[in-house]
Every structure is written in C-alpha cells, then in structure tokens.
UniProtKB/Swiss-Prot annotation:
Disruption phenotype: No visible phenotype under normal growth conditions, but plants show reduced root size when grown in presence of hydroxyurea. No visible phenotype, but decreased accumulation of total arsenic in shoots. No effect on arsenate sensitivity. No effect on the accumulation of arsenate in roots, efflux of arsenite or uptake of arsenate, or the total arsenic accumulation in shoots. It comes from the Eukaryota. Residues 34-135 form the Rhodanese domain. Changing residue 86 to S: Loss of phosphatase activity. This is Dual specificity phosphatase Cdc25. It is found in: Nucleus. Zn(2+) binds at residues 53, 134, 136, 141. One of its GO terms (biological process) is response to arsenic-containing substance. Substrate binds at residues 45-48, 68-71, 90-92. One of its GO terms (cellular component) is chloroplast. Gene3D superfamilies: Rhodanese-like domain (3.40.250.10). Expressed in roots and at lower levels in shoots (at protein level). Expressed in leaves, stems and flowers. Keywords: Cell cycle, Cell division, Hydrolase, Metal-binding, Mitosis, Nucleus, Oxidoreductase, Protein phosphatase, Zinc.
C-alpha cells in the first residue's frame, strides 16, 4: 500500500525496456543487410582478418567486447536493428548480443535499438550458402567490396 503512482510507472518503464534476442537466416538478411537502419556486428576475433567478412559489418572482437560496448552503442546510434554473428553463432555471437541487452537494460536510456538478432549459422553459414564475402582490409569496412 505504500507504493506511489510514480513507482508503478517507473517499474512499468523498466519492464518495457527489456529486450529480447531473435534469430535471422542468411537468406532473410541478404536483402536487408545494406539498409541504413541495420548494423551487422562481427564478434569474431582474428579469423575476420583472413576469412573475410560481411560487407559493411562492424568489427567488435568478442575478447574485448565488454571494454568497447559503449563505443558500439555510440557507433550505432542511428540504427534500430543489430545483427550479431561469429563463425557459427553458437557461443560468441549470442554471448555478445546478451551482453549488449544487459548493458542497455542497465543504462535504461532509449538508444533507438529495437531489434537485436543473431545470424543463424554465423559467418561460416553465410559464406557456405554462397552469400557475398568481402575481403577488404578497411577498418571499418565501407561495404564497397560486395
């Protein structure tokens, strides 16, 4: 009975900010990946340098992801959808996506990020299904190569 109306709305706002993570296939992502509202986040470590990457993707290695998470949020401030991947999207990609969700929920500020997704089968699945692979050395990749 001691709860104020303010605490009711504050609690409701916190619950509304909780984000979920969904999956997207390479076939679903291909026609969308160059849209200006989408950012592809590659969390592979060194293998990005020799295996190639999805054109236009941003690289935030999983090993240093926590240290650079605020930079990532700043870098994608004009995006509403983030798609995470690693080699297979079984460990590093989902882990980093969850870390971002936790970070955003802790910060409780509206970043504009509405959708956090994981690329099914990761980069290896993307490449194996014949999707375009960029092998440029540009950091960040401008996406001109595929």
């Amino acid at each position: 009975m001691g709860r104020s109306i303010f605490s009711f709305f504050t609690k409701k706002k916190k619950m509304a900010m909780a984000r979920s993570i969904s999956y997207i296939t390479s076939t679903q992502l291909l026609p969308l990946h160059r849209r200006p509202n989408i950012a592809i986040i590659d969390v592979r470590d060194e293998e990005r340098n020799y295996d190639g990457h999805i054109a236009g993707s941003l690289h935030y290695a999983s090993g240093s992801f926590d240290d650079k998470i605020s930079h990532l949020v700043q870098n994608v401030k004009d995006k509403d959808t983030l798609v995470f991947h690693c080699a297979l999207s079984q460990v590093r990609g989902p882990t980093c996506a969850r870390r971002l969700v936790n970070y955003l929920d802790e910060k409780k500020e509206d970043t504009g990020i509405k959708n956090i997704m994981i690329l099914e089968r990761g980069f290896n699945g993307w490449e194996a299904s014949g999707k375009p692979v960029c092998r440029c050395a540009e950091v960040p990749c401008k996406g001109d190569c595929a």
